[in-house]
Amino acid sequence: GATGSLFGMPYGSETSVLGYRKDIFEKHGLEVPQNYDELLALACQIPELEPGMGGLASRAASGHHAAHAFLLHLNPLGGAIFDESWEPVVNNAAGVKAAEALKTIVDCGAEGSVNFGFGEALGSFLNGDTAMFLDTTIVAGQVDNPDKSKVVGNVGWALHPMGTKRASQTGGFGIGIPANAENKDAAFLLMQWLTSKEGDKLVAMAGGNPSRFSTHADADVNAKFPHMATFGEALQYADPDWRPIIPVWGKINADLGTTLSKVLTEDLDIQEALDGVAARARTVMDEAGYYTWNE
């Protein structure tokens, strides 16, 4: 458009949910964690009950993966990167608690957890090396695929555990029409069909991620994929602001991720680490002109 803004239709909505090994939980009489205290306790209890098995698979590799994992916990624990005036608050008590949670999870994880990206964390869960997985809903299809998973039929799904509030990440994809498209009318009709109730249900029945709440609640969909009702409930708590969508976020995110990696691998003091992230983030924001209203 004239403003250069981007618009699109949601397609394949995702959020964070907790996958857990039903067989392991039943074997040891464990309850599905409802809050972070229970989650962290289980993450470190399971390796004691099942030697060689990690508690909770998590991203942790330096950069984007460590930052993503931190943000996954920051929001439910009541934290944020910025306050309403765009002042960094990542180093407040909630931020420290989120970093402590991530370190506990990684320390009690499977061998090599500190270097896990998304693929490695998922692989650890699919291979049966870890008892829990807290990340995106898009993995459900792989969990149920015998060609990719050793835990088919042994995984249950639950809402992202409560922190100070019920919250989960927001992800997914979108579809739009390029300004220079030659067949805009045809493209619009295709978008209309793909995002329709019929199209959304076809996606779900094929094992994909639907976008409509009605699809998540559909009887046919749930008969084939019983987890869909839980995923639909989880989407109601998905926070679109779980990470700042601003032009300079990439730079701040990279710094956050590399700094957190030092917390995980070098035992850098958490408060010191987050104080540094906050100070550098403010410099980036200042240089980008975010505080001109204060001048």
Predicted regions and their residues:
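Short helix-initiation/N-cap motifs at beta->coil->alpha
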Residues: Q34-A41, S113-N127
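Periplasmic-binding protein-like
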Residues: P51, Q192-S214
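Paired acidic/hydrophobic, glycine-rich loop segments that form the ligand-binding mouth/hinge
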Residues: A131-T136
